[in-house]
């Protein structure tokens, strides 16, 4: 759903969403007991997709940390209705050097998506016992999703992110 409200920075109010309500948000609600050494992929996007006739599309994909558990956060939303992306997703990409700029592919469970990054928020922390390596890329998602009843939904122009994280905490 579009996000609306007011963001106050240094005492100055900024309207979010505008008259068209075209600001989008994703809530990251994580909890639990995480292992000391963990890796994951995560990506999300939302907005109105022109190839989908202006329908509101949301995308939530992840990998690695849930492999082999039978559960995942993977889902595709169309006009507020959630369609589960069943099974594991396959991620094809590289964050070595400047290769993060190359398109990323995420497939599986009816999803065939491409992510084209335009910015990488790269962070590295190395405190010997505690380490964090994150490549959080922002860019544009496009592709298609096939629903359980066989409808193929093509989408494009969704601004979002995809990340690779490896933490030792």
Q: Which residue ranges define each predicted feature?
A:
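Structured soluble/peripheral alpha/beta segments that form catalytic or ligand/cofactor-binding pockets
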Residues: 1-169
